[in-house]
Amino acid sequence: MLANIIRIATRQSPLALWQARYVQQCLNHLYPDLHVELVPMVTRGDIILDTPLAKVGGKGLFVKELELALLEGRADIAVHSMKDVPVEFPDGLGLTTICERDDPRDAFVSNRYDSLEQLPEGSCVGTSSLRRQCQLRARRPDLVIRDLRGNVGTRLAKLDNGEYDAIILAVAGLKRLGLEERIRCALSPEESLPAVGQGAIGIECRLNDDRIRQLLAPLNHPATAARVQAERAMNVRLEGGCQVPIGSYAELEGDTLWLRALVGAPDGSQMIVGERRGNVSDAEQIGIALAEELLAKGASAILQAVYHESSSS
């Protein structure tokens, strides 16, 4: 491996390529003599577009092919949306760098209505996220929630074709693609608790590759890393994947980390919520403790029902 080359494994969607190019630009700024190459590839999650994500099954739908490239030495790092990163990694790989978080909120997108409250009874809202579905149904049980797959451009086209009255996307993704004007309103965490790691970019690499880890070190954002660590620790304890009705969002107030979380039945009939505060140095323990609280309130029954539904479909 030449010392002045680094290869980035990335998905081929416009948003994934934006994220990979962002990391590429950061590295080029830090190391002007470094040659940074993109290695675009297709993942299973990109191919299976006619099935709701929760029913596709398995974890790491958007990362496994990238991880294989790392293990086989075809790439040096993989760039991910943190909300797509599974709770476990293959032996020898790990998440070493989390870049500064962008806006973590969900976006309400519609051509006719300015907010969720304005939607008439029976309006059709598109999202494949069980997390978004359960919160939408709990708040507006009179709406029709339908699955919506594809990249951001595909989803917007389906909205524009009249298939949906509104759709829910991530604010960060729309901003990164220069589509901020499509956002009618951003949903606060109180209205729609974000996904674990939403708005943050993570970088995975071989744990024994000291050269790469040293190059990546300046890209790590400690405050973001602590927040995401708490969110992911909670998700790990709940044994949650990417396609589960779990929301988790941490904020920093000085040295205090405030973590909020929910586990919801996809039909909106039940929502288990909790929150916990503690010193930022205890981020992982805060996440685990909050997960234990949710489990004690009955979260495991909701999650088991979701897993049973996805495995039997």
UniProtKB/Swiss-Prot annotation:
Cofactor note (record): Binds 1 dipyrromethane group covalently.
GO biological process assignments: protoporphyrinogen IX biosynthetic process
EC number(s) stated in the UniProt entry for this protein: 2.5.1.61
Entry GO MF terms: hydroxymethylbilane synthase activity
Range of residues in the leader sequence: none
Keyword Glycosyltransferase on entry: no
Keyword annotations: Porphyrin biosynthesis, Transferase
Reactions this protein catalyses: 4 porphobilinogen + H2O = hydroxymethylbilane + 4 NH4(+)
Cofactor(s) of this protein: dipyrromethane
A Gene Ontology term for the protein's cellular component: cytoplasm
Pathway annotation: Porphyrin-containing compound metabolism; protoporphyrin-IX biosynthesis; coproporphyrinogen-III from 5-aminolevulinate: step 2/4
Residues the record lists as S-(dipyrrolylmethanemethyl)cysteine modifications: C242
First-level EC class: transferase
Database matches in Pfam families: Porphobil_deam, Porphobil_deamC
Subunit composition and interactions: Monomer.
Note: The porphobilinogen subunits are added to the dipyrromethane group.
PANTHER family for the chain: PORPHOBILINOGEN DEAMINASE
Assigned protein family: Belongs to the HMBS family.
Main function: Tetrapolymerization of the monopyrrole PBG into the hydroxymethylbilane pre-uroporphyrinogen in several discrete steps.
Name used for this protein in its record: Porphobilinogen deaminase
Annotated organism of origin: Pectobacterium carotovorum subsp. carotovorum (strain PC1)
